[in-house]
Amino acid sequence: RQMCIRDRFSPDHITHTRFSGEIELGIFEKEMELPGGLKKKTGLHHVTLHNCSIGNNSLIENIPNYIANYQIGSDCFIQNVNLILTEGESCFGNNTEVSVLNETGGREVPIYNRLSAQLAYIIAMYRHRPDLIARLREMIEAYSLAQKSCYGKIGNGVHIVNTGTIRNVYIGDYCQIDGTSRLENGSINSNREAPVYIGPNVTAEDFIVSSGAHISDGVVMSRCFIGQACHLTHLFSAHDSLFFSNCQSENGEACAIFAGPYTVTMHKSSLLIAGMFSFLNAGSGSNQSNHMYKLGPIHQGVVERGSKTTSDSYILWPAKVGAFSLIMGRHVNHPDTSGMPFSYLIEHGNRSYLVPGANLKSVGTIRDAQKWPKRDKRTDPDKLDCINFNLLSPYTIQKMLQGIDTLQGLKQTSGETSECYSFQSTTIKNSSLNKGIDLYTLAVHKFMGNSIIKRLEGAPFANLNELHDRLKPTDSLGEGEWIDLSGLIVPKQAVKDEIDRIVGNPDSTLEETESFFQAMHRRYYDMEWTWVCSIMPRWYGKTVDRLSPGDIIRIVRQWNEAVVSLDRMLYDDARKEFSMISRIGFGVDGSTRQRDFDFEQVRGEFENDAFVKMVCKHIEDKTALG
């Protein structure tokens, strides 16, 4: 019906091409260099275009069917793609409802291009505020309607080769799609700073993929949101699931999960189902059940941040596991250990045993805390998720304080000589209870001392008044309970205030809520200090404005003793990895001496291990600082 061509247009590099509908063509002047060094002139060859616009210097060739209703940018390479079309009006995956946590519905999260882990958490978990959910749905629907179009878009610098069908998909700049089977109703939010790769045999429908993601090798997904820098490969399958920044999923299966930042599952036999996770490391054969064969798959579970599941672990939902816990064995009695962070949850004799605080002295916990920031693969300057990596924070310390009270209460009610204590469908041994109190106490001393030292560091003061001025809180927020919004650690009151603002203001926007999360993330340490000041009367018996230099000295000494004690526990735990048992299988055909030499060649010497050196230096530095 109509064809628009740009200045300097030449048809010399258009062959075996059919046009219909409204067509707009750029110029074809440059050569494109392909992998292996092959150079091709840009142009159109063996392709049928209907209602399409093509930018400058793109190469499109060998399209068996056709391309319809697409705006294609400049410098694109599209080759051997069966079919690319937009059919009817589409929001390109925006406002797709994902039945997360409960497969039968009730916690649906409508996904959109800029969905953050924090907003998704509120939509999924705050169903006790139907007014809030209704307002957020309205805002997301309005955003999605703004994306609606009869034309799909393929951005600049996109490569699509050897691919099957692409239907109703928005494709951002510099995306690479290679050997993909089928993509339907979605958005791929690639950009120059953080390109997206969609690889061989991927099938996806009703999805949104964020910048920097890598999806390849037979992944099958339906009704999913994939966050920034996520990595899904090796036949992984998922439906009705949300994956946020830096998740890594391979081989296994996910059904209706809320995978907060750094959720990692790598093994074929692992099934994550109907659970909320973040900073998770799932061992091989890790499984859960959300179905008791009565009213359907209606149960859910929460594994708080930083937890690990060992090989063949199993949890029968509903259950709730505390932050930074280790889960070993099968647990079918619905434990709630959220009040006991850094614990071991171990099955023995068909009973769930809890070892409070045991993970505080585990070298693996500290390694995790160090590696998470280093493994942040997000290169997009516009980061959607707010991520706090701190092991010790008001969120975990408040739970330890509650844990100390709970453990001491168990001793009083059941007697100090009791062999075992019952707690939330778990059993705590007497020795574990007493060690748990000691470990939690050390951790609180470490956190409180850290906070005070950081507050005073680099700030000279000449008298007591100047000391108190420096210690005075500078943020009005921070007192009371803190919560973990899937990566963002924040005062509960601040979230409540934001919810009230959203509900009470009919003109509130998604951008304002994004800004709120970012502001809370920036203000974390100021709010943390406000919280520290609020618990000083309980922990030290004095308010912050009553602390004397002698009190500061005492606090720093307690901090130093706690830090060094915990570091020595880590040192001893690391030494176990170099024990005689760890050497079994080394020097397979040699003598004992050859076994030890083989071990040292492969694993190195204990004193030269990088982590061991770090712990030793940490002990020296903190001792000197103290």
State each model region's role:
Residues R1-I5:
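Short, small-residue-biased leader/transition segments that mark boundaries at the very start
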Residues R18, G43-R137, V161, R167, ...:
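Phosphate-/polyanion-interacting regions in eukaryotic proteins
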Residues E138-G155, I160:
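A charged, amphipathic alpha-helical module
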Residues I154, V158-I177, R182-E193:
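Core alpha-helical transmembrane segments of integral membrane proteins
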